[in-house]
Each structure stands twice: as structure tokens, then as C-alpha cells.
Amino acid sequence: MKIAIVGTGYVGLVTGACFAKMGHNVWCVDIDKEKINKLKNGLIPIYEPGLEEIVKKCYNGGNGNLHFVNDLSECIHDVSMVFSAVGTPSDVDGSADLKYVLAVAKRFGELTEGRQVFVTKSTVPVGTAKKVSGVIAEELLKRGKDGTEYWVASNPEFLKEGSAVSDFLKPDRIVVGVNTEDEIARAQFESLYYPFTIDNPGKLIITDVPSAEMIKYASNSMLATRISFMNEIANLCEKVGANVDQVRRGMGTDARIGNKFLYAGCGYGGSCFPKDVKALIKTGHDNGEPMRLLTAVEEVNKNQKIKPLATLRKELGGFDKKNILVWGTAFKPETDDIREAPSLVNIGSFLKSSSEDGSS
């Protein structure tokens, strides 16, 4: 198939490269000309194991099936599907800022000649597809093409930084949200993901669009909840003399619980969990459903991030004339992403405390 991926960040570049590895013809689109030029020259803007090799092989000096362009107009008439993989940062009130997603939708509406699928790959709140469809329809109306047929779908990503390539090529599940009547869009997704479903058709989960949008937020919020829960258990274990690693092993052998996401630490960070928990809390608030559990999860995580500083102060008796090494600043192994990383909170707090203690 021929597809376009708008946005070349973690999600967009990994998605585009892996689709190309599967044999699809892929155009990766980004308005950042410097980034596109670097990609054409084999310079990958992010670190992700296995990604550089795939990009270089599929791009093949411009002769492969992976292409890099600056505007959707350079490929819109060659593709049947356009994926929006641009950022959805948290707004001041915690909601997801959709300006980049809607900008892509606007450009799609300005260019499409119809019978194409617009896919939101970015993590977006429930109701985004309706907004996207409205923007596209408005642009088509301006062009006098208000009868043009197109489809809007949701295909959330489930990629973990540090193992994103593996996650894409060996997915636990593939979630696609399409309207019941959009049989053509559904058929295109079935064709696109066929290599993953040959032996396991149930791996492709097709839902209505709002459910697909909610699945991603609910999944990430559930994982964040497990992290905060185990951090609270670890803190209590420390007070009562229990060993949290032994507790974790005892819990994880219960098939209903499992071993994953039971490791205590200094809180979750990165580009997804903090943003998605905030967005789901805001969605609940806007719809009269206060998300009390997630509000507590967020508060526990905030406190957990500063716990290393308190522990260190206690062990060292203060920071006066102490040299402290922070080993690793990314929010997790096998990535260079420091967004919302606990290390940044501790470094800032340490510098402030060092000044108060009289050290330089």
C-alpha cells in the first residue's frame, strides 16, 4: 500500500520506517526542513534501537520505498491513507492540545480529491475524530467539493520508547476505530496490517472511533496506576521492614496480576504517561466524572519523584560540600528522552538545596 505519515517524531518515524520495512511505500512528512534533510542524509534525530538501520535500508539514498518530504502536497495524490502522528502536548489545563492534529486535518482538506482515509495515530482524547472530520469538511466546502468522500479513523499507537521498533513489528494488539458504515476504510486497515494477522486474526481489534480513542488513554492510565501503586507499597515496605522485591515476586506470580509494571522506582516520566493521565482527568472533569483514582495516581507520582532527594539528604546528613553524581537522565533505559524525567526534578531540587546548605 501507499501511505503518508505526517510527523517524524518517535511515533511518526518509527511507524513510517516499520511500515516501509513491511514492504509498503511510505512518505514521511514534516514541515521541519532541517529534520527532513538530516533524515535524507542518514541522520536520525532520535535514539531508538534498530531504527537507524531500518531507515537507512528503506530510504536507500532516495531509491527505496521510504521517502521524506516537507509537505503533504508532495505525496497526497499517491497515497490511500494519511496518518497524523504529530504531537499532542498538554495544555495549561491538562487537556491535550490538538492544534497540530487539526492543522494536519486542515491541510488534508485543502488537498484531498477524495476516497482517502485520514488516520489519527497520535494519542488524542475522545471526540477528536469528530473535530478532525469537521475541519476537513470545512476545507472541502471552501473548495466547492463538499460532496467529496473521505473517511476518518483512529489507530492509536502502543509503542514504548526504547523498544518501539520491536513493539511495532511484534504487537500485542492492533486497535482500529472506524465508523460501522465505513467498509472501505476497514478493508484498507485489514490489508495494511494483514502480515500481523495471518496467524492470529484476533490481533486486529476493530471498534467504533470513540472506543479506540479511549483505549489508548485507559491503557496508559492503567499502567501509570500500577506504577504509583507499587511505589506506595515500596514506601510502606520501607517503614515496616518488608522487602518490596520479595513482595513484588509474591504478587506477580498471581496470574490475575502478572509481573509487569510491578517495579518500584522514582516515578513515571516521558512523553506519554504524565500527559495522558492529565488528559484523562481533564476529560472526566469536562464530562462530570471526577477521576479520583487517577488524581491520586498523579499526586503519588509527583511525590515519588522527589523521594530520592530526601533519601540522599538523610543518608549524607545534608549536601554541604558534597559531590553528587546523577547517573542517567533519561526517564527510562534505551532512550534519550528526558521529558518529565524524575532526574530533572531531582537535579533542580538538589541545586536549590545545595545552595541553601552553603555548598556550590
Outline where the language-model segments fall.
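Structural/interface elements that position substrates and couple domains in central-metabolism enzymes
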Residues: 1-360
